């Protein structure tokens, strides 16, 4: 929505053709919100595990809007279980939706990004932290997210000569999303969260500049561009000092 307010053309590609009972919304409702915010929108029903469908989606997006400038790898699966308690089916799911999808989507978007004067790939994954605690409590999930970051490191170097910027972005704190309320706590968890707006503002700042090969935290990005007051990002102003630091950050 942050980009939409600047008049951007936005493609919403996901499996949610109908509102999800736990996640809420659909690709169509999000498209309506993008248009209401001032942008143009195209909703595409897509499973990022299907490489043929991804290639078709990229072609459809490029034909509809005349090209692709920015790819945001935002699809994600979460499983907060250790090796002993993670079924293989769940393991395969989180690997395929997280780091494999970054490979598939980035590769499919590459021919179009090479033609752009402002090509960007931004993946939502953390800086790599080898503190054993993150490799113990939920190693399969950690592997999938670190895989996204490692791939981004490689692509930043590989695509440099094409003028394509490749970076990652991760929240410094819990963000009030369904992933938090469904997997970490409950509806009361929003009291220790920030609003998604901070990630949107940070992402917009990243794609508005030409740095590459960086692994950003949302607050750090905004501080780098002069933001000093973060209180308005708190979901509950009364508990702004109790906001929880996110996974993978010591």
Stretch-by-stretch model annotation:
Residues 82-83, 87-92:
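Substrate-binding pocket helix/loop in short-chain dehydrogenase/reductase
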Residues 106-107, 153:
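A short, exposed helix-loop element centered on a Lys and neighboring polar residues
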């Amino acid at each position: 929505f942050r980009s939409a307010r600047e008049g951007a053309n936005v493609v919403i590609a996901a499996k949610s053709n109908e509102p999800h009972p736990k996640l809420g919304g659909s690709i169509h409702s999000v498209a309506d919100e993008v248009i209401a915010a001032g942008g143009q929108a195209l909703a595409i029903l897509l499973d990022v595990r299907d490489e043929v469908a991804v290639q078709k989606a990229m072609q459809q997006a490029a034909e509809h809007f005349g090209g692709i400038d920015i790819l945001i790898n935002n699809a994600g699966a979460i499983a907060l279980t250790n090796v002993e308690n993670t079924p293989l089916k769940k393991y395969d799911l989180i690997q395929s939706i997280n780091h494999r999808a970054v490979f598939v989507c980035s590769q499919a978007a590459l021919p179009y990004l090479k033609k752009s004067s402002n090509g960007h790939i931004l993946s939502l994954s953390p800086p790599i932290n080898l503190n054993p605690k993150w490799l113990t409590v939920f190693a399969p999930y950690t592997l999938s997210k670190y895989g996204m970051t490692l791939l981004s490191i490689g692509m930043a170097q590989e695509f440099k000569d094409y003028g394509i910027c490749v970076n990652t972005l991760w929240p410094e704190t819990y963000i009030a999303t369904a992933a938090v309320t469904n997997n970490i706590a409950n509806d009361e968890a929003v009291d220790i969260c920030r609003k998604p707006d901070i990630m949107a503002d940070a992402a917009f700042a990243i794609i508005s500049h030409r740095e590459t090969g960086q692994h950003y935290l949302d607050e750090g990005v905004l501080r780098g561009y002069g933001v000093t007051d973060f209180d308005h990002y708190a979901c509950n102003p009364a508990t702004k000092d109790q906001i929880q630091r996110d996974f993978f950050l010591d």
